């Protein structure tokens, strides 16, 4: 059985980890970085760039470069959070037929899980390159405060990427696993995981206990805000720059998509710099132009100014902390350790506020960018049966219930209930001779169902005629370890029942997921063909170069006819190298290799005559051997070709 990898699918950055024995290993991607920007670019020629290459070209291709898509996953178009993002994002967010928020790229509508799948596919490939084997199973993390629709959509993204998602695990819980397993402290400890990432905020109170040599991680409570994170901090800086520039030059940059993309990059850099310096300068020449000519942007921002701009955002994280402490039934003084997760927790003001609330310094021995992926890998090891000394007890973040008479939300499973869990309750009909009941399932904390998120509905039909209140209908709720809900309803008199796995009131249908999986496979086939074409092109160019070099040195030793034949073969190969026909390139490579055999023999004979066989090896390669190898894909050239291929990609 292959390894189960751990993936932190982040709003801004993603990370992949595996376990080597009992040691976690965060894997570097093809660009050599341990985290990958969650950015996807759709190019004009159909190529899809993911990560750093996508980020590098964002300024020139803002409408087709997607970032922060996790903020849309599992959400309806009409939700106020989505509406807020529509005005801020350079790309188009549109309404799908099922009411979900989708994205439009190059005249094509795409679902957020389909886009996130591109990032997951890169994470999968990163792990496969390192392990040297195919990876098919993963544990993927989500914010603890993600609702059922968002969890289901994340699982769908995994499937589209070709992964069997063994478990969806909450990010703070994963970070606690990463923290707790390498600590040798004995006895029970309560920890707070404060997770402020690129797009979401979570706080979890977790108890780590030693039970018969086994470490038990029990989540006592969780709270958060799935629309608060580093992207919002960046936006405050962008708005400030736009305002200052307008005051100074009279030009409004908010409608200039290219300028906005440059501002976003500059804002993110400034925010990061201000975590370690007191002042930074934003310098963007030629940001725009008007009738008077080009305009340049130059602005100094101090740490104090940034803190003033985002003060209320940081304050918004404290109320969920208060609620989580109360729900866990503990006091702030009971917390042994505070762990900071997510890139935004590097901001000194955030650390100060956390210290102020919890009354203690946060631990500095946890990597905020990598802890979540490491925890996911540990959970993967547990699920794979390779680790028996860990037990993880997570919770459902929000209450679940059904709508009953008068539009009331009758809660079946309360928030912070340990999962997996089951619960059933008996209900009856509201009208005489009612033949069917509609079960509407909601998630949230409001008293009235309409104030909560509707997850789905289904009917139980064929109820025998009876006065209202007589039929006995048992409704059962079952939450699995992924936090995904299964609901059933049964008429006790007839034994008739109906069950559903809640597939959000919208979400992707099975057929849509299958289509996206097929699309992804087709893309992979296209990528493979493109890669093979580039390989052939590189080999062809290398052969032209080496043959020309040998011809310059030894051409005078050939008969005129032989030399003409080689030069004609070089020209033929150069002509086909301009095109995209792999078969034609391969054929001309073979033809040049054959034509230059005589040249190779001359080179070799000359070297032997001089007794310099070693020195001649390189030149001999220009003849028959180099030609033949290039024609048949020389294995020793693979690494060189890889590097050249990436370089080509990055410049697109």
Curated annotation (Swiss-Prot):
> Could you tell me which Pfam families the record lists for this protein?
HSP70
UniProt-listed InterPro entries: ATPase_NBD, Chaperone_DnaK, Heat_shock_70_CS, HSP70_C_sf, HSP70_peptide-bd_sf, Hsp_70_fam
According to the record, what induces this protein's expression?
By stress conditions e.g. heat shock.
Residues recorded as bearing Phosphothreonine in the entry: 200
Asked if Disulfide bond is a keyword of the record, the answer is: no
Which chain positions lie within coiled-coil regions?
Answer: none
Location of region: Disordered: 610-652
Q: Where is the composition biased (Low complexity)?
A: 611-634
Which superkingdom? Answer: Bacteria
Its keywords, alphabetically, are: ATP-binding, Chaperone, Nucleotide-binding, Phosphoprotein, Stress response
**Which spans does this entry mark as compositional bias, Basic and acidic residues?**
643-652
GO molecular-function terms, A-Z: ATP binding; ATP-dependent protein folding chaperone; unfolded protein binding
> Per the UniProt record, which residue ranges are transmembrane?
none
**Summary of the function given for this chain in its UniProt record:** Acts as a chaperone.
What family is it from?
Belongs to the heat shock protein 70 family.
Q: Could you tell me what this protein is called?
A: Chaperone protein DnaK
């Amino acid at each position: 059985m292959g390894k189960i990898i751990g993936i932190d699918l982040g709003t801004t950055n993603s990370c992949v980890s595996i376990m080597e024995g009992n040691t976690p290993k965060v894997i570097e991607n093809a660009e050599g970085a341990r985290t990958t920007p969650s950015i996807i670019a759709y190019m004009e020629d159909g190529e899809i760039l993911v990560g750093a290459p996508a980020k590098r070209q964002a300024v020139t291709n803002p409408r087709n470069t997607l970032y922060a898509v996790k903020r849309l996953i599992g959400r309806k178009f009409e939700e106020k959070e989505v509406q807020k993002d529509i005005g801020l994002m350079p790309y188009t967010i549109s309404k799908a037929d099922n009411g979900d928020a989708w994205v439009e790229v190059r005249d094509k509508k795409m679902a957020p899980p389909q886009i996130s799948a591109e990032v997951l596919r890169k994470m999968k490939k990163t792990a496969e390159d390192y392990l040297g084997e195919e990876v098919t199973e993963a544990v993927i993390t989500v914010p603890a405060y993600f609702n059922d629709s968002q969890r289901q959509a994340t699982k769908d993204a995994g499937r589209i990427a070709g992964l069997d998602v063994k478990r969806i695990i909450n990010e703070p819980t994963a970070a606690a696993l990463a923290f707790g397993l390498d600590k040798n402290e004995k006895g029970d400890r309560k920890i707070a995981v404060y997770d402020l990432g690129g797009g979401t905020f979570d706080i979890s109170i977790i108890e780590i206990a030693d039970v018969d040599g086994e470490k038990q991680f029990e989540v006592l409570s969780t709270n958060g805000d799935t629309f608060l994170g580093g992207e919002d901090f960046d936006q405050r800086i962008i708005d400030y720059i736009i305002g200052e520039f307008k005051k100074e030059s009279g030009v409004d940059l908010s409608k200039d998509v290219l300028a906005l993309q440059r501002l976003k990059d500059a804002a993110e850099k400034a925010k990061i710099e201000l975590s370690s310096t007191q002042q930074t300068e934003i310098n963007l020449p030629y940001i725009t132009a008007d009738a008077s000519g080009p305009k340049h942007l130059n602005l100094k921002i101090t740490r104090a100014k940034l803190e003033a701009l985002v003060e209320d955002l940081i304050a918004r994280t404290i109320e969920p902390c208060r609620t989580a402490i109360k729900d866990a039934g503990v006091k702030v003084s009971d917390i042994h350790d505070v762990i900071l997760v997510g890139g935004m927790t590097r901001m000194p003001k955030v650390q100060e506020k956390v210290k102020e609330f919890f009354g203690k310094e946060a631990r500095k021995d946890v990597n905020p960018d990598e802890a979540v992926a490491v925890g996911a890998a540990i959970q993967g090891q547990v699920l794979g049966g390779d680790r028996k000394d860990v037990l993880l007890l997570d919770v459902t973040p929000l209450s679940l219930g059904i709508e009953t008479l008068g539009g009331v939300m009758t809660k079946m499973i309360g928030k912070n209930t340990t999962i997996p869990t089951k619960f059933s309750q008996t209900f009856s009909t509201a009208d005489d001779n009612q033949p069917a009941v509609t079960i509407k399932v909601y998630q949230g904390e409001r008293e009235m169902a309409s104030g909560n998120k509707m997850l789905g509905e289904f009917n139980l039909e064929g109820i025998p005629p009876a006065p209202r209140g007589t039929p006995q209908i048992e409704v059962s709720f079952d939450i699995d370890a992924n936090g995904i809900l299964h609901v059933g309803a049964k008429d006790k008199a007839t034994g008739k029942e109906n069950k559903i796995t809640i597939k959000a009131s919208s979400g992707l249908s099975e057929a849509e997921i299958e289509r996206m999986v097929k699309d992804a496979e087709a893309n992979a086939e296209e990528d493979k063909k493109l890669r093979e074409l580039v390989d052939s092109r590189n080999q062809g160019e290398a052969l032209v170069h080496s043959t020309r070099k040998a011809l310059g040195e030894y051409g005078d030793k050939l008969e005129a006819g032989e030399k003409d034949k080689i030069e004609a073969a070089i020209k033929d190969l150069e002509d086909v190298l301009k095109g995209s026909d792999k078969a034609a390139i391969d054929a001309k490579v073979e033809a040049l290799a054959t034509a230059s055999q005589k040249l190779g023999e001359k080179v070799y004979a000359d070297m032997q005559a001089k007794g310099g066989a070693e020195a001649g090896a390189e030149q001999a390669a220009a003849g028959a051997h180099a030609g033949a190898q290039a024609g048949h894909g020389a294995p020793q050239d693979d690494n060189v070709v890889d590097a050249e291929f990436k370089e080509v990609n990055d410049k697109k």
